[in-house]
Structure formats: C-alpha cells, structure tokens
Amino acid sequence: MTEALSRAELREMARESGLDILGVTGPEPFSDAEHYIVDHIERGHTRGMDWFTVARTRESCDPHTLHDTVQSIVSVGIPFWTGLSEPPDDGILRGRIARYAWGRDYHKTLKRRMTALVATIEKIVGRPVEARTLSDTARIVDRAVAARAGTGWVGKNSMIIVPRHGSWVMLGEIMLDIHITPDLPLAQDCGRCRICLDRCPTGAIVEPYRIDAPRCISYLTIEERGPIPFQLRPLLGNRVFGCDTCQDVCPYTSAARPAHDPDFEPVTIENAFPSLERLATMTSADFYATYSGTAVIRAKRSGMARNAAIALGNSDDPHAEPILIQMLRCHDEPLARGHAAWALAHLTGDESHRPLTLALQSEPDPSVCVEIRQALDA
C-alpha cells in the first residue's frame, strides 16, 4: 500500500503542533484489551460505574465503530510534569490536587493541538482528510492504542509509561483515512518491580495491571457522587482531587524531566494545593471562578467540599476544628455537612460530641443525621 505520509514527517509536524510524543498503529480491533476489560467488569472492578458496560467496551475496542474509513490511528502524548512537588510552607492547611488537573483542561489542550496537526496533514497530502480526534472523553481504549503504537508500555499501575517521561503524559488519538506504516510496540515492561502495588494508599491495585476502581482515590474523589466509604476516608490524607501516589513512586516516572508547558502549569497555588478552608467554604461563584477551564470542575463543588472536609479531618491540626464546625452548621450541601460530621469526630474525638449533638438538633437532612449519629457513636 502506498504511504501518503511518512512517520518522520508526521513526527516533525506533531512537534510543531505541541505534541511531543507520537506513535502509529493500524485500525485492527484491540481484541486483547477487549477480553481484559470484559473480564475486569465481570470481576466487579468497575462497580458503581453503570456506563462502563460490556457493550461499550466492545465498541471502544473496534476502531471502525468510531471511524468507518480509518486506515491509521496516531497516538499522541503531551508531557505535563512541572517539577513542583510540595505545597509552600505558609502555615495554611492545604489539600492536594492530582498534577494532571493543575493547568488547563487537558481535553481542550489535546483537542486544539490535534486539530492543528490534522490541518497541517491536509496541507501536506493536498486534500481534505477524514479525521477524528479523541481523548479519554470518547469511546476508545487510549492505553491499548498507545501500547500497540509504541508510544509507551502498560505499567503494573495500568498507566502508560513513556520513555524519559514516565506516566506524566496526556494521551490522545487521531484516526485518519490515510495509510501510515505502523510502529512496533516497545519491548519493555516493569520487570519484578511492584512498588506501585505496595504503596497504593487504599490497596486499589489488587494485582499487577488490575485496579479495583471503587477503592482508587481518583475514583472516590472525582467520580463518586455520594458519600465515601467510612473505612477509606482516613486513607485519603489531604488528597482532594485524584491521587498521584502510584506515579510518584514509580522509578520510571520519578526520573521524568519538567516539561515546562504553560498549559499544564498551575495558574495559582490554589490550582495545585488549595486552601482547605477556602475549598470548604467557597460559594458556587468562587468555585467556578477558580476552577472553570480545568479538570477539577468534573468533581463539582459539592464533591470538592466533601473531599475538603475529609482532608481537614485527616489533618491532625487543631486549626481545622472551627472550619469543620462551621461546615457542619452552615454549608448548603448535605454531602459536605455529613462528611464534616465524620471529620470533626475523627479529628477531635470526644470533644466533638457537643457540636455534633447541637447540629443534630437542627439538621433537616436525613442523610446528614445518619452521618452525625454514626460520628457520635464512633
């Protein structure tokens, strides 16, 4: 088959579009990924995610269901490691947001850069191209594409590990009606290393390459819309959006170099290490003013307030007590008030009985009353 575009040309154009990482694979179904994901669902590791179905999995693993004239799939990546690791020592109780969400919403950044690359491809080939750009909002198995395209390999934490960048990489795909000679998968793996399994705060990596999603802090703090299970709350620490632990401890990822990409730098410290007091008390207007245009919006204000309450309860800092009492009395979200009750009891023990009892007398929401009673009985 005649090649309309070489990989070398494509890589150069990708770099000019801000896409530093690139690999190419064909449009064949991702059968191995399909078998693995269906087994994952049947084991119950996606419970709570009703949209994560076998039918959707089969569709996601067959590129022709997404683009019927696809001949090549381009896997692209943007490194996002900033080099910043710890919050400032400023005496403020701060939470921790996963690094990928520090800057602009990565979906929009990927979309913009992939669209620019498609426009350049059309100029080179001299015709309109039937293309579809995808990130993890669309139904395609990003990591299976990246692995087969030689972009990186799948680590035991299920993340794609890219040479020189580790897993600090945003992935996207471009489906093209152009034949490009595919890359070969990388002949590399994690060997005997299992540090990510041993260090996962909640034990969510139940075996190599398999995550029990409802135990994962990323799922709990972002996707879970209701209460977080009691036994997992102390394990969240000060994480209020996502978790980077299995990446932080990875030997490949810890050697990554800063990307210096302005789209992924935090606009302010609040986008990386937010003040827990501010997060616990901010209005809807404040929340959207601070996090609009970032991935944090996905967790919603109620979810972030809930997460802030847990982080305050885990802080072991007496300055958190009045913040939690204020949340318990005044927050307009029942989810936040309920978790503030747990956090207050977790933080202060028997000293929480009086404010909890007073709150119970005036609390109108049955779910919050249940949380308060459980906190009193703890």
Regions found by a protein language model. Give the residues of each.
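Short, charged low-complexity linear segments at domain edges
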Residues: 161-185, 213-232, 284-288
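Flavin-dependent oxidoreductase catalytic cores
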Residues: 185-195, 205-208, 297
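Structural detector for internal amphipathic alpha-helices that build alpha-solenoid repeat scaffolds
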Residues: 305-316, 337-349, 369-378
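Amphipathic alpha-helical scaffolding segments comprising HEAT/armadillo-like alpha-solenoid repeats
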Residues: 286-290, 316-329, 349-361
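Glycine-rich phosphate/pyrophosphate-binding loop
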Residues: 268-306
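Alpha-helix N-cap/helix-start positions at coil->helix boundaries
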Residues: 298, 302-303, 318, 332-335, ...
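Iron-sulfur cluster-binding cysteine motifs and their immediate structural context
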Residues: 16-19, 29, 195-219, 225, ...
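Auxiliary alpha/beta "docking" domains used to position bulky ligands
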Residues: 1-189, 237, 364-366
